[in-house]
A protein has these predicted regions:
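Long, charged N-terminal interaction/targeting segments
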Residues: 1-86
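Ser/Thr- and Asn-enriched, surface-exposed coil loops between beta-strands
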Residues: 65, 110-111
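Short, intrinsically disordered linker segments that flank or connect zinc-binding domains
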Residues: 87-91
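Flanking scaffold residues of small Cys/His-coordinated metal-binding clusters
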Residues: 95-98, 108-109
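Short cysteine-rich clusters marking metal-coordination/redox-active sites
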Residues: 100-103, 114-117
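Cys/His-rich microdomains that often coordinate metals
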Residues: 107-109, 118-121
Length: 122
């Protein structure tokens, strides 16, 4: 079941492929951000299609850093990234600072998790 979902994700967003059938780049990131990241991927793809760059788009690294998403991308031919894509990534990196990494609810910008998810650790 999970492999089928991963195949569908990779077919839709090839840059989520990390070379391992059972996992995608999405699986390496906090669960609470999955919807946010998929929304970002949808917007990125819409722009990539306009510029005929879907096959050239790569994510070099994606991670949680300082309570927010850090998304490092490039084009495989090293041509400049269209500003529209850079703007999309920046928008979602900022939004991620307000989304709980565990559940996806709103949270303070200076915390990794919302108060509900943080409660067991207090």
């Amino acid at each position: 079941m999970e492999r089928d979902r991963n195949r569908e994700l990779i077919e839709e967003y090839p840059w989520l492929n990390i070379g391992y059938e059972q996992l995608t780049l999405l699986d390496t990131l906090p669960w609470g951000w999955h919807d946010l990241i998929l929304d970002m991927c949808k917007e990125i793809k819409r722009e990539l299609v306009k510029y005929d760059l879907v096959s050239k788009y790569e994510v070099i690294e994606a991670k949680e850093k300082w309570y927010g998403l850090s998304w490092y991308d490039a084009l495989s031919d090293l041509s400049p990234m269209p500003f529209a894509i850079t703007d999309i990534v920046c928008k979602y990196e900022v939004q991620s600072r307000e989304v709980c990494t565990m559940c996806g609810r709103s949270k303070p910008k200076d915390q990794e998790m919302c108060d509900v998810c943080m409660e067991p650790y207090r």
